[in-house]
Each structure stands twice: as C-alpha cells, then as structure tokens.
C-alpha cells in the first residue's frame, strides 16, 4: 500500500511540474456591442497555481531627463537593462491602467530561430511599460512596436489582447532572430459586437494590407 501511495504522489508531482512549465494561457475578448452593459472586456487566465497570485501595482510618475526604468524579465526576474523614462507615466494595477487600458497575452512560441535573445524587452515588460505609457489601445500598439524595435525583443511569439473603453485589438508578434533587432507584427481590431479568444496559438491568420485603421 505504501508503495502504491508513493507512486501516486510521484506521479502527481510530475504532473504538477509539467503543468507549471506548459504554456496554458487563455484570453477571452468581448467588445462592448457583445456585452450586456456595453463594456469592453478581456479575461486573462493560466492553468497554474503559481501564476497571478498577486496584482502588480505601479503609481503614476513624473520624471526628468536622465531618469531610467529598470527592465527585468517577467518570468524569471532576470535583469535585462535600463530604458529612459518618459516625462510622465500612468498608474497601473494588474493588467489595467488608470485610463482603463487593458493588455493581456498568451504565448504561441513560433519558430525557435526567431526567438529574440539580443534585446532587453521581454513580453511581460512590453505589457507593463505600455500600460505605463499609453492611454488607448492604438497608442499601446505603437508603444510596444517602438520599444521592441528600439531596445530589441527578448521573448518568443506572443499574442496580445489590447482593449480600451472604445476598441478591442489582437496583436501577434515575434522576433526577427539573433541577427536582427525588433519584431515582426500584425494587429487587427475586433469588430464591435463580436467575441474573440486565443489560447497559445497565433490568432491572426489573414489580414488586409490596405486597411491600417482596422
């Protein structure tokens, strides 16, 4: 009986260990036209008992020339570098800031040779720095692209869910590999009245080349 119990405990421990390491995030995006109260919504869940046990808080700030922000990899806490602070940053709690801008993500990985390793902006830092610097979803997309292309990308392929009080967007991005800095990316607006979801798969499969507004 003891042998069986030990085997079951070891099996459970192995299962839990593999579950923590696996990519198991889910985002559900609801536009205001599809919600009963007229609100845009984004949910962010991960199948892990170790994730999202706390809400990250950063107060609003006013900065002067020369002030720097430290960048640590979100998953590991590894120090990656510093970037200059803008003149002002916004308060954020969890994955929302004071302007009701929301950014969440799921990791799809992508081709391993495109994984970014020559920059300092990992996917978590892109999320939280964008929340500190942007008021709207469109501004957040621009901030993310500018940060990744300026300071380099340090993660694998990601799908970001980005929403404000008016619009909901999905953004897929991936690095350019070890020899190039920056990201390849595409973003699409979720039409009002629709619901969208993604779970560790690149979400955007087709997109128009002549419709930058959507």
Where do the language-model regions lie?
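Positively charged n-region of N-terminal signal peptides that target proteins for export
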Residues: 1-7
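Intrinsically disordered or highly flexible coil/loop and linker segments, enriched in small
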Residues: 2, 17, 153-157
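Bacterial N-terminal signal peptides
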Residues: 7-18
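Second-shell loop/turn segments in exported
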Residues: 115-116, 125-134
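A contiguous strand-loop segment
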Residues: 25-123, 143-214
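Sec/Tat signal peptide C-region and signal peptidase I cleavage site
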Residues: 18-24
């Amino acid at each position: 009986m003891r042998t069986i119990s030990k085997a079951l405990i070891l099996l459970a421990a192995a299962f839990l260990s593999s579950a923590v390491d696996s990519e198991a995030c889910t985002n559900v995006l609801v536009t205001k036209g599809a919600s009963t109260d007229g609100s845009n919504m984004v949910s962010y869940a991960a199948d892990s008992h170790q994730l999202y046990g706390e809400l990250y808080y950063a107060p609003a700030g006013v900065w002067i020339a020369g002030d720097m922000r430290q960048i640590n990899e979100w998953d590991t806490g590894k120090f990656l570098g510093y970037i200059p602070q803008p003149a002002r940053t916004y308060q954020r709690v969890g994955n929302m800031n004071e302007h009701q801008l929301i950014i969440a993500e799921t990791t799809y990985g992508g081709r391993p040779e495109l994984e970014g390793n020559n920059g300092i902006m990992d996917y978590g830092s892109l999320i939280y720095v964008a929340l500190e610097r942007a008021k709207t979803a469109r501004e957040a997309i621009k901030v993310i692209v500018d940060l990744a292309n300026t300071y380099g990308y340090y993660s694998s392929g990601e799908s970001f869910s980005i929403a404000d009080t008016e619009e909901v967007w999905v953004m897929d991005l991936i690095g350019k590999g070890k020899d190039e800095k920056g990201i390849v990316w595409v973003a699409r607006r979720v039409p009002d009245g629709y619901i969208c979801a993604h779970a560790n798969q690149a979400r955007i499969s087709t997109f128009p080349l002549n419709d930058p507004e959507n």
